């Protein structure tokens, strides 16, 4: 008698295998990622918990959505990342890097205002930054040319690392609350909650 194979059974098997394959990168990331064992408080003197007034005391000029180092504050002028000074471009035709460091703030309609992210550039390629961070923090999650490291307290570091050489390297420090949005955008919520290695509860 010819054996009858149920289509429903086959479909469930395919779904189970697909889920296992989808979870593998996330589980590998969590089990071999040193970053998830540490907290990330901010970038150097710029801590995520600083108030708007404290950011101004550091010498940053703050507007509606950002704070920048337009006046070259002495306390921030000599900051380095991976041994390289923060990149300032004084070329009047290329002002995208002029501020060096940009602190992005939460909306004014949501007081008290807090830091969402800290963006800066250094005189390295994106690939060099990514390799250095991998040595320090282990594997990363890669999405749309960005490499991400997520920390125990929910904060994250991302560096732009496309296939073509990108210089100067762009790096972003994400505050915990904002990093949650990034993580959910990279990995679907149901996928994260289904992983025993890393869940949204950790954030």
Predicted region positions:
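Bacterial N-terminal signal peptides
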Residues: 15-25
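Non-cytosolic coordination micro-motifs
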Residues: 31-82, 111-203
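Serine/threonine-rich, low-complexity intrinsically disordered segments
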Residues: 6-7, 19-20, 173, 198
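Compositionally biased P/S/T/G-rich terminal and signal peptide-adjacent segments
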Residues: 76-109
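Bacterial N-terminal signal peptides that target proteins for export
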Residues: 3-16
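Residues at beta-strand starts and edge strands
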Residues: 13-15, 99, 114-116
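Sec/Tat signal peptide C-region and signal peptidase I cleavage site
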Residues: 26-30
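Short linear motifs in intrinsically disordered/low-complexity regions
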Residues: 9-11, 50, 90-91, 95-96, ...
